């Protein structure tokens, strides 16, 4: 293809202001001439190189000097220098845009490189690799990582430590963040990785980690090199805009749906980090059907198959007023609430309180099948939050100045100025009872097997939703509106995992706790005694080996950072009687322990007896497959089993 520009071959994409990053002399200059725009471009054809209207470089062999000549056109007339310490926020914003432009070009070149390698066009691959190196020649982060690797290889640990402290490179890795100035119960799993011109901290939900999905950018650390050869960092918090809660009013006009519609064609509930949408197909309404006797039997059989000896209390099901909200207790949910004739609001509240005092037992379980391919399915009666996570956020972003303080080897604090506790915690929104009922209906349709979910829906009866489920849904919607919002101070601690997975009692696990969805816990072996054990002043204090599981993500009952269970695992601690558990569950060993439960809002936290189960990973039936561990919480009123699968963090 003929062209008048010596450095240009193939189809061209112009990259405005790409030149700013390629001249070390001009990297400190905030103002560059705009009336002398360079035709800096990159080819996306089979042959590629960089182009300039004044360059005479060989198009078949783009060189570093060619790249810099192309980049230096606009900077030639700029004689004043500026220290990056003097950059104002507008100048930083321009730098952010420039970095994004470079990153898009590098991403394009890497994509071409992968295609060339796949086609075994190694000559083209070499050229593309050289082009990538030239495009990132002034990338401060790439230079820092090279220097760090060289210092470690040459055992210059003092230089390596200095780089880690001064450039943010020591923060690369996995972290868990907990708010310091907010009562929010949820922790954040964050992965900090080096990128083009910056270190990127991405937040991951348990579902994103299980599905190996891309994380959501939470904060960034931009690094630039000053005139003295040192480095300057600028931390920014990535705030997602357009986070308005959009729920169609028509979606909640009715809360009844036929059994087939609720199972096969339910409303689509979509939460994208900070945006909650309910999309409804035409002429589709939420209707409730009449549960059949066979359907109720399917429900009971399904639950009793999970845990032997499970006791269920089933009441009569009759017409329930739409305005009525109802019944579950914490992480366990009622199967069917006792219905009454339409009454006033005060009678409804009294009925709800009476029903919540009934001792109705249920079991929460999880489906660990196909963890890597699909979102895991958990069995939770009345669950409403399992399937409303999503890994993508399409909102526009706004960068807000932040800073990192109290940096240690395995901890640091992210400070976002101006984000007070009052601003974070007081943004509450009213949710109608119709919305709550619709969300609960959707949750049942998604969570239960068809024959089980169908039993809950009929032509005349509707499922009553408890006060606690109402609060759960309100919390979910509030979280959806808050999205990726951080508190003003967030303390991060490094997640240290074992190099191998040979020890079942050391590492990360993912499990489902009641209706709150999947959560991540970290197991660690310890030796000593439990802090709240009785007889602490006694002379015969017993020390023993035990395993402790700490929640990294958390839920409104037991928040992140709390111990969720512990069990003795030393010599003589293994229990021999496995007759209480079905053979299909695959129990290899069991250990006596304790589990922590609490009321909503982490009220009345208490320890209950429990058993830690080591499983063979084969599972039982189509609903529970591949679980590695389980913990049975034995409460005074009800017991429930939580199954865990080992979680391996991506490198």
Swiss-Prot record:
GO annotations of cellular component type: chloroplast; thylakoid membrane
Transit peptide, UniProt annotation: 1-69
Alphabetized InterPro entries for the sequence: EX1/2
One Pfam family here: Cyclin_D1_bind
Compartment annotation: Plastid, Chloroplast
Principal place of residence: plastid
Domain UVR: 103-138
Region (Disordered): 330-359
Annotated PANTHER family: PROTEIN EXECUTER 1, CHLOROPLASTIC (PTHR33917), PROTEIN EXECUTER 2, CHLOROPLASTIC (PTHR33917:SF2)
Name of the featured protein: Protein EXECUTER 2, chloroplastic
Originating species: Arabidopsis thaliana
């Amino acid at each position: 293809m003929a062209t008048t520009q010596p450095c240009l071959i193939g189809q061209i994409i112009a990259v405005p202001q790409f030149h700013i990053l390629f001249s070390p002399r001009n990297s400190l200059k905030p103002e560059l001439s705009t009336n002398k725009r360079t035709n800096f471009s990159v080819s996306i054809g089979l042959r590629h190189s960089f182009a300039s209207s004044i360059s005479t470089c060989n198009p078949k062999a783009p060189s570093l000097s060619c790249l810099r000549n192309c980049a230096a056109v606009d900077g030639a007339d700029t004689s004043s220098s500026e220290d990056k310490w003097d950059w104002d926020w507008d100048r930083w914003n321009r730098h952010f845009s420039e970095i994004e432009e470079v990153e898009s070009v590098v991403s394009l070149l890497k994509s071409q490189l992968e295609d060339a390698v796949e086609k075994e066009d190694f000559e083209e691959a070499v050229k593309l690799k050289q082009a990538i190196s030239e495009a990132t020649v002034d990338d401060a982060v790439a230079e820092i990582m090279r220097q760090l690797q060289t210092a470690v290889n040459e055992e210059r640990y003092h230089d390596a430590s200095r780089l880690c402290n001064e450039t943010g490179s020591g923060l690369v890795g996995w972290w868990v963040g907990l708010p310091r100035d907010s009562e929010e119960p949820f922790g954040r799993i964050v992965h900090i990785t080096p990128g083009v011109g910056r270190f990127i901290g991405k937040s991951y939900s348990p579902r994103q980690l299980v599905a190996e999905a891309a994380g959501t950018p939470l904060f960034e650390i931009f690094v630039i090199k000053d005139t003295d050869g040192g480095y300057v960092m600028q931390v920014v918090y990535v705030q997602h805009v357009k986070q308005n809660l959009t729920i169609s009013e028509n979606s909640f006009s009715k809360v009844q749906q036929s059994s087939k519609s609720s199972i096969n064609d339910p409303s689509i509930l979509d939460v994208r980090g900070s945006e909650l949408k309910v999309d409804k197909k035409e002429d589709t309404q939420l209707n409730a059907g009449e549960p059949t006797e066979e359907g109720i039997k399917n429900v009971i059989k399904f639950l009793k198959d999970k845990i032997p000896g499970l006791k269920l209390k089933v009441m009569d099901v009759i017409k329930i007023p739409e305005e009525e909200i109802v019944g579950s207790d914490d992480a366990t949910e009622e199967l069917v609430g006792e219905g009454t004739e339409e009454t006033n609001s005060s009678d409804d509240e009294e009925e709800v309180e009476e029903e919540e005092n009934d001792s109705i037992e249920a079991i929460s379980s999880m489906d660990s099948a196909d963890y890597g391919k699909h979102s895991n399915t958990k069995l939770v009666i009345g669950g409403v939050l399992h399937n409303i996570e999503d890994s993508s956020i399409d909102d526009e972003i706004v960068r807000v100045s932040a800073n990192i303080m109290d940096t240690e080897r395995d901890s640091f604090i992210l400070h976002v100025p101006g984000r007070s506790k009052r601003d974070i915690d007081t943004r509450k929104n009213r949710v109608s009872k119709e919305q709550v009922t619709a969300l609960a209906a959707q949750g049942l349709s998604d969570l239960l097997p068809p024959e089980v979910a169908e039993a809950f829906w009929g032509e005349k009866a509707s499922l009553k939703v408890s006060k606690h489920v109402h609060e759960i849904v309100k919390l979910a919607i509030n979280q959806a509106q808050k999205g990726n919002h951080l508190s003003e101070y967030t303390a991060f601690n490094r997640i240290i995992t074992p190099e191998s997975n040979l020890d079942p009692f050391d590492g990360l696990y993912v499990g489902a706790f009641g209706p709150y969805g999947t959560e991540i816990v970290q197991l660690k072996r310890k030796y000593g005694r439990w802090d709240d054990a009785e007889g602490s002043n006694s002379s015969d204090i017993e020390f023993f080996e035990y395993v402790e599981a700490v929640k990294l993500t958390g839920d409104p009952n037991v928040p992140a950072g709390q111990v969720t269970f512990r069990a003795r695992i030393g010599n003589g601690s293994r229990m021999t009687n496995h007759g209480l558990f079905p053979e299909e569950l695959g129990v290899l060993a069991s250990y006596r322990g304790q589990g922590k439960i609490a009321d909503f809002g982490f009220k009345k936290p208490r320890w209950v007896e429990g058993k830690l189960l080591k499983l063979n990973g084969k599972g039982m039936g189509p609903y529970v497959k591949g679980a590695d561990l389980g913990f049975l919480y034995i409460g005074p009123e009800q017991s429930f089993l939580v199954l865990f699968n080992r979680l391996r963090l991506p490198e």
